[in-house]
Amino acid sequence: LNPIFLFKNKEQKQKFADDVISGMLEWHSVTNDKFGSLSNPIYDSWYDYYKEEKQKPWLAALKELSNNGKFSKKKLQLLIEATELFNNLPEENTKPVLIHADLNIMNIMADTKTLKLTAFIDPCGSIWADKEYDLFQLRNMWGDAYGLYETYKSNSEMSEFTDFRVAYYASMHEAAMRLKGGLIMPLWEDLNNARLKREMKKLKEKM
């Protein structure tokens, strides 16, 4: 989605957000018995999937990078502290749903004149996951300018821990881009980490 769409009016942006979230809710209504890859999901628990496939290997590799001076020790410590909080949260009643897994604003197409949604693209990383894992990309780059994340939350039942978990997923994913040869955007990483710190503070106040 071109940044020029930021200049569309409020009504157009909200209609766009409503259409995007309607599409997301449709594929989130497709469920499965287990979490994991589309072709071979093997995990009974979302936390088990995330810890084994993402959290543990990512943190181990980031620690190695940090020891070699290629990843900030301060950023690593933030992720370690956030991980401890994440792992101590109840998993709640999560169920495996179909997610896009990379639905940031650049993977959404719209008509240049009307901002009418025309397509979702690049669903190459789709998996069976907790629906919350599809939400952090909605806030990536300038997604918040369209209210995508808040629109989703207003149209679906969410957990009291959603904001923290989504912030955690975002910071972990951004840090892990170093391990995949992906493009590192320091601005987005700093914004994600700042949001994570705020959500950690809120969560600690609840506990």
Roles of regions detected by a PLM:
Residues 1-10, 32, 59-64, 172-187:
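A glycine-centered beta->alpha junction motif in the catalytic cores
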Residues 1-41:
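ATP-binding pocket architecture of kinase catalytic cores
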Residues 12-16, 95, 162:
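Conserved acidic
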Residues 19, 78, 144:
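Charged catalytic carboxylate motif
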Residues 27, 80-135:
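Active-site acidic catalytic loop and adjacent metal/ATP-binding pocket
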Residues 28-39, 64-68, 90-95, 158:
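Surface-exposed helix-capping loop/turn segments at secondary-structure junctions
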Residues 40-88:
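Active-site catalytic-loop/activation-segment of kinase and kinase-like phosphoryl-transfer enzymes
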Residues 125, 136-207:
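Helix-rich C-terminal or lid/interface subdomains of diverse kinases
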